[in-house]
UniProtKB/Swiss-Prot annotation:
This is GTP-dependent dephospho-CoA kinase. It comes from Thermococcus kodakarensis (strain ATCC BAA-918 / JCM 12380 / KOD1). Changing residue 52 to A: No change in activity. Changing residue 48 to A: Loss of activity. Mutant shows a dramatic reduction in growth rate. HAMAP family: Dephospho_CoA_kinase_GTP_dep. Pathway: Cofactor biosynthesis; coenzyme A biosynthesis.
Length: 177
């Protein structure tokens, strides 16, 4: 049975607030501002533009999630080809069980020294939530805030609790509902 979590109207408003520190500026400014921090910790990127720009400043994310779209338009980022590639389906406005399982699997591979790229068929916009939930403490998770900059999340117990609360507040849908 397929199961997924769907974003509610109330949560949409909450998620407009960044889950971490918003680093403002036009590209590549935000990435250059956080580069020193990124070089000291494991990094997870969410989004095509974020992944491409982190790679451009010489930082290799342990896990990169993207959907080959930006602002709902097709996008072909320049990405590395030495990583393990996984694919998963995740419709817009949802977090599927398949996405949760794939992110968990990716962290298992990353623990063994592999860099992992996850190509999301659908949308990866909410993927920072499972990334934070499964990431080891101290990991940095980055996602884009369109037309504003990049959000830098330092994974802490408090941050994990906030993401778990968001996931628990989402509407649970089972195949056929």
């Amino acid at each position: 049975m397929k199961m997924f979590f769907r974003l509610t109207r109330e949560l949409r408003d909450e998620l407009k607030r960044p889950l971490g520190e918003l680093v403002r500026g036009p590209i590549p400014e935000p990435y250059l501002k956080v580069r020193g921090e990124l070089e000291k910790h494991p990094v997870v990127t969410v989004g095509d533009v974020v992944t491409e720009n982190v790679l451009k400043i010489g930082v290799k994310p342990i896990i990169a999630l993207y959907d080959l779209k930006t602002k709902r338009k097709e996008y072909s980022p320049e990405i590395e080809d030495t990583a393990v590639f996984l694919t998963v389906t995740n419709p817009p406005g949802t977090i599927t069980k398949a996405l949760l399982d794939t992110v968990r699997k990716a962290f298992g591979l990353a623990e063994r020294g592999r860099n992992v790229h996850i190509l999301v068929s659908g949308e990866e916009d909410l993927a920072a939530i499972p990334a934070v939930l499964y990431a080891p403490l101290g990991t940095l998770v980055l996602y884009g805030q369109p037309d504003e900059g990049v959000v830098l999340i330092k994974v802490t117990p408090e941050c994990k609790r906030r993401c778990a609360k968001i996931l628990a507040s989402m509407e649970v849908v089972r195949d056929g509902d």
